[in-house]
Amino acid sequence: MDATVEARILDLLLELREKTGISIVFISHDLGAVARIADRVAVMYAGKIIEIGTAEDVYYDPRHPYTWGLLSSLPVFAGEKGELNPIPGMPPSLLDPPPGDAFAVRNPQALAIDYEQTPPMFKVSDTHYAATWLLDERAPKIEKPSILKERLQENSGRKQKPDKKEMSFLQKTEQKQAPVLIEARNLKQHFRIRSDYTIHAVDDVSFRIREGEIMALVGETGCGKSTTARTLAGIYRPTGGEIFYQGARVPDKKDPFGMRKKMQTEIQMIFQDSGAALNPRMSIRQIMLEPVKISRRIRDREMLENRLREILKETGLDESILAKKPGELSGGQRQRVAIGRSLLMEPRLIIADEPIASLDISIQAQIVMLFKKLQQEKRFSFLFIAHDLSMVRFLSDTTGVMKNGKLVEMAPTKELFENPQHPYTQSLLSAIHIPDPLEERKRRLIEYEEPQSLGEGWKELSACHCVRI
């Protein structure tokens, strides 16, 4: 769900509980949403509850290293260098669980006993229990990551600080001078359902993406983000408007210079459901090499094999997965395969449509940091479509807000989050959850009153910050 709908659903659940007295079991990856709705929180790992307590216990005084890792993975706790802190490694297979504490192999604070014996539930207080040998009276005293306590104190009751370090003047100058890679001018994508009914999925949208830039598109479900991306990638032919790629207009029909073929190889897409995006009957090797063979991008077999091994290393995958099928991989591994497949094509632009929505918090952090590392190394442009506004704030340089098929606001990400001007943007940002139970319960959604028309003009408030009026 998008942020505003999610906030309304949570408020509805709380209202129903207040009126009827029902109990609610709320299962979620979203730690901000959990902070808003839950009285008690149970944290599970490898099929077992490893920590349980009141929301305040778990968020303000976490005791299990896995809980530390989950909270540290959130963008709100990104360090001064603008880096997330994902938990290393992958969850274990429940078909062959490891002995002792299942989290030990991923736990930097693991003790020798963690690899041998499963820890019991230790009592922290009357309401708080955690299954970690660190709570045994004989264990060495290891402090939780200080960043958790420091950042919670920083953000409680105040506006969040920027999640990533301010760019240097040199970086800003270089970005401004970067040439435009792709541009949409008055782009329209209409779908005629029947003779008297047409859906205006994208309606008069204009923006540009520079080389090496990360741009995000946000907005409610059905606002036209994905349709815009697919039209930009050439999956749909635009109903109206123009697309320019590297300064040349992309032809609607006849294509004597092969512009569309060039775009098909240089623009790659990564989808939300990595399972559906990978053919279940093919091996990972076949899946990754298929687009290269179709496009004949790399014809030398030895060069292709070397490039494949390089990509596996860059995306953190082992060569042993090449013989496996997608169903044998975890969600995070499948998404890494999808990223690797796109990188094999040596793209100029990657369009990622909700690429982390179905992943848990720590794996989300791993994938986002992988995106960031690869983008900095290879300098491809990146269009990031997401509902998770905290990740958008962390990752993107520029953000566009869409509503009913139109762009209503476009600005550098830092400026948009600190000074939103359009009422819809203000409503959307007010729905961002923070992992702080006491503060999250005080916050209220700014309701957006739908006008008869979103307006046809643009007002430039400052350099690169425009709002629809």
Regions found by a protein language model. Name each.
Residues 71, 302-320, 429:
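Conserved ABC ATPase "signature" region
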Residues 344-348:
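A short, proline-enriched helix->beta-strand linker immediately N-terminal to the Walker B motif
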Residues 325-329, 333:
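Conserved ABC ATPase signature
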Residues 241-252:
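Conserved ABC transporter NBD signature motif
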Residues 55-180, 413-469:
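Charged, flexible cofactor/metal-binding loops and thiol motifs
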Residues 233:
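Helix-to-loop junction immediately C-terminal to a conserved catalytic motif
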Residues 5-83, 359, 363-437:
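P-loop NTP-binding/switch modules centered on Walker-like glycine-rich loops
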